[in-house]
UniProtKB/Swiss-Prot annotation:
Function: Gap class segmentation protein that controls development of head structures.
Localisation per UniProt entry: Nucleus
Compositional bias annotation for Basic residues: 17-31
A single MF term (Gene Ontology): DNA binding
Record protein name field: Protein hunchback
Protein family (similarity comment): Belongs to the hunchback C2H2-type zinc-finger protein family.
Record field: compositional bias (Basic and acidic residues): 174-193
Top-rank taxon: Eukaryota
GO cellular component, one term: nucleus
Keyword Zinc among UniProt keywords: yes
Leader peptide range in chain numbering: none
GO BP, one annotated term: segmentation
Upper taxonomic lineage: Eukaryota, Metazoa, Ecdysozoa, Arthropoda, Hexapoda
Amino acid sequence: WYSSMFAANIKQEPISHHHHHHHAHHSHHQHSHDSNSNSNASSPHQSPLPSPNPPSSNNLQLEQYLKQQQQQQQQQQPMDTLCAGAMTPSPSNNDQNSRLRPPGLPNPMQTIMPANMRPSPTATTTATTTAAAASTTTAATVALQSNDKLQALTPPMDVTPPKSPAKSQQSCAEPEKEHDLMSNSSEDMKYMA
């Protein structure tokens, strides 16, 4: 999930460069992990206690498994900081990354981002749509009222004059509506950030 989002975000960066980095990290960690497991495996062979071998080998497997888990978590972290660093070109992400990284979780982006990102888009969309609906209705009512006033003010004249002011009033209300939408969305963004 987040890797696809992250890949989409990275498009402006040279992808090969990023992947190369990722691989460098990966192979480096793989190597250290291998040497770790080797030293672990060699130490029990050196110990001259063959009798409690089954339980100790069991424990060893468990230990190695745990170590591997830790190693994997650590392995993901450079990827995350790398991903966060690579995502910094877009400013909106910058904010979220700086907030997402401080909690010292093994995998901050994956654990927090779904929780952070999934509810918030719905929240913002509902907020903007309601705001947009409100602004359009207000603009429409304003236009209607002024139309009524114009027509009420100019009944004795011909039918064409009230129409042209009505048109200009419409075009006047149109940018206003867009401005409302813009200010609303920017306020939402401020609220989000």
